[in-house]
């Protein structure tokens, strides 16, 4: 609903330019049209007069009055007020919200979507777990946030590529192989010859058992069969990594998360991309050798110190394949790249940005963008849950899904701003009460379904066309408040995408559900008067549609019965 007001204001500015009140070279400033915190200040407010006054040296309140007088007439605007130093407050007629409610039902699943992304390609990387163990709750938060970001970007007109980067190279993989080999040889944690830095979870025993049994793993494009040879570390490596990839994929599928691309870190070495990237950096003149090591002049690009790329023993530091990987994204045509990571990766961001800038191939500063999430604390019975027998040291994503549900787990892991620490209360997530936010929102959806079912059972035929034409019958405040809340949805979708903050969708849905439940408790719906009843059912159906659209962005279901 902001766009028509912005257009109206721009027309007013053009009128003042035409009559000489404003200089002809005065361009419409980057003004804000926003909803005030309280409706007593109007439905929308703008700071345009104050911005124009700075450019022209005019009194902002007087300029606001002049601009208001120049605005074209709009049937949607009931009155306009000047407030404070020059804010212009718009009070809308209820008809504007009634029309927006009708738009919801006309646009159906597309309501709230826009084309601002212009079909440009954006790569969204998330989860990207090491294939060394089960997915933990931190990976779950990354999956929920990343998947919701991808859905948000699609809703804003972007062509989204979902990507999972497997860190299947390095010391951690070597530790995995030694752990499985030790288990296959009959050793267990605590034994004298149990390897240092080995993984102790029960899942290692499961892998070893499957390996010794000669099991096969059915991956997407191949079948991997164990050789059962406990001395063949290459075979154990191949089997164990793919066993855990398969397990992680199983958990992600249960979490309704899928990817377009699975990228293996090992492929960067196999295809020579790491060496190629290092050579490009050497050729760019932004490296030097010291102490037998190769250094990147990362301080030239905003890092706090230069970084070692290749150690004196010839091995690469961990951020070098990260540069090669992100270079591959750029070469694949990603105009925009977003990487979702745990906050513990913060230290690597500057060096990756520095490496990409040092390539001098036109990658813009700040590419890729990063979304960092903080840790998750799991609580049950008022106490922190720290251990899982299967993982040997942390709560897994599978644990949460099995103890609560996919819907509850996704909601709770999205519900806070990514850079805020999150407490996952298992007891609350299992409650069927209004204290549980996902239940509260889904119950609003189910309530509308129940209303429609009751109407059918009572032979109260619903005429949507009549309902749309009769929304002006709903003159009470709770109905208007519900329509206003519905109308906010497209703005929230756009803002959440711009800020890369999917929790804003969850917050909005809770507020919409509250407005609906308030309306439901204060307004008899299935009344005798058919015109009034159709209008109320139309408002209820519009609410249900927005709830469905928003829950879909979160990857949360819409049960018709609770």
Curated annotation (Swiss-Prot):
Database matches in InterPro entries: aa-tRNA-synth_I_CS, Arg-tRNA-ligase, Arg-tRNA-synth_N, Arg-tRNA-synth_N_sf, ArgRS_core, DALR_anticod-bd, Rossmann-like_a/b/a_fold, tRNAsynth_Ia_anticodon-bd
A GO MF term: ATP binding
Intervals of motif 'HIGH' region: 129-139
Main localization category: cytoplasm
Keywords: Aminoacyl-tRNA synthetase, ATP-binding, Cytoplasm, Ligase, Nucleotide-binding, Protein biosynthesis
One Pfam family it belongs to: DALR_1
Keyword Metal-binding: no
Tree of life domain: Bacteria
Catalytic activity: tRNA(Arg) + L-arginine + ATP = L-arginyl-tRNA(Arg) + AMP + diphosphate
Its EC number(s): 6.1.1.19
Alphabetical GO biological process terms: arginyl-tRNA aminoacylation
SMART domains in the record: Arg_tRNA_synt_N (SM01016), DALR_1 (SM00836)
A GO-annotated cellular component: cytoplasm
Enzyme class of the recorded protein, top EC level: ligase
Compartments where located: Cytoplasm
Recorded coiled-coil stretches: none
Subunit structure: Monomer.
PANTHER family, per the entry: ARGININE--TRNA LIGASE, CYTOPLASMIC (PTHR11956:SF5), ARGINYL-TRNA SYNTHETASE (PTHR11956)
Protein name: Arginine--tRNA ligase
